[in-house]
Amino acid sequence: MKKHFLTTLLFLVGFSTLVAQDFSVDANFRTRSEYRHGQGRLFQKEEKPAFFVNQRARLGTSYQNEWLELRLTAQQIFTWGDAQQPQAELKNHLGFFEAWAKMQIDENWNVKLGRQVISYDDERILGGLDWSQYGRFHDAAVISYGDFLNIGLAFNQEGQPNVGNTYNVGSASKNTYKTMQFLRANKKWQDNSLSFLFINNGFQDFDSSGKQDGVSNMQTTGFYGIFPISSLMLEASAYYQFGKFQKTSVLAYQLRAELIYKTQEFTAGLGMEMLSGRDYDDTSAKIKSFNPLYGTAHKFNGHMDFYYLGQNLQGTTGLNDIYAKAIVKFNEKSNLLFMPHIFMSNAKRADNKSYLGTELDFMFTQQFRKDVGLNIGYSHHLPSDAIKTPITHDMQNWFWVQLNIKPTLFTTKQ
């Protein structure tokens, strides 16, 4: 794989000197050291904390002329020390994060084909998940009309069979879809922006013997908007989920609103998000817990990723997240974020305890230069008696340091 990628890269560099309008080679080196003492799950009294360093290494090439744009990005993700020495088989092999071609049909319409990041608006439903070292991509075709309209189509298979089209990569419970279609429209005027999204996901179903048993289609639709109100900015979203998931009817919703006040040196925000859940005594045969699908979950509901990315509340009583944020800007290259959350159950719990806990998130950002940045984060979780057990540790925290280097290695224009 490495040999093939380097051969392709050298070919493109040589080719670019003859015909390219724009050609560039870029890299991304990102390390993150983490101390985990309650990240993603409650830490127990007899457990030992985890510490590790993981790394992302990407090498990308871009080519562009007046009608065609190409992008190839190879990446390898690994944890320091997870391969024995001397060189052995890599646990996480080199693969392509991006491999797409974008063709301009006319001055407005274009089509983008291949492995690509699909990210819109606040990334609540469709996002790049860049916090994850792996990121998130889709193998899809996206037809766009300027910045106004995007239509996406995807059909996934795990190979090239001669018979049948059963899809059994991952599982539906992890939102691995067999088919996806979406339509997103955006309108901007003055300082306002309003987006509409409709997405259909088809999930492969299986019977009790493991044989293919049709496809369940689940739909998600809603709006996202940004609106100025005097000296404030309102950011809001609302989504409704219906259809079927694993042969079960779905009826769920998401609502979020945040007021933001911003100056050159300071940003303050106050918001609330509601993700529907199911009452403990609800006997209806419906899924009522909202599924955030393919968004950047790390941006929402606390940096410790306990409630949704940690899978601790999906399929249960949902979540109400009341939060605030303050960003102090020290200079053009550094700032400090503080973001407290109060978590409550959206639906009724058997113990009648709606308060789930509080999380305090801190993040310092320092940009040393255009292509080198440092992030330092600390989060503290205070779970309530509703989710604690007798063996839950009194201290739930998480500390991390991330260095991100993104240089442009080579560029040529003609």
Predicted regions and their residues:
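Sequence/structural signature of outer-membrane beta-barrel proteins
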Residues: R32-G40, I77-Q85, Q116-L129, N156-V169, ...
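C-terminal functional modules
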Residues: G318-D321, N346-A347, P407-T411
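Sec-dependent N-terminal signal peptides
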Residues: H4-G14
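Transmembrane beta-strand segments of Gram-negative outer membrane beta-barrel proteins
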Residues: A20-G40, L68-L72, L149, N192-L194
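Flexible glycine-rich, low-complexity coil/linker segments exposed to the extracellular/periplasmic environment
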Residues: T283-T316
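Surface-exposed loop and membrane-interface regions of Gram-negative outer-membrane beta-barrel proteins
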Residues: Q44-Q55, Q64-E107, I118-W131, F206-S209, ...
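Signature for the C-terminal beta-barrel architecture of outer-membrane proteins
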Residues: D22-V25, F51, Q104-V111, L129-K286, ...
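Outer-membrane beta-barrel "beta-signal"
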Residues: D394-Q414
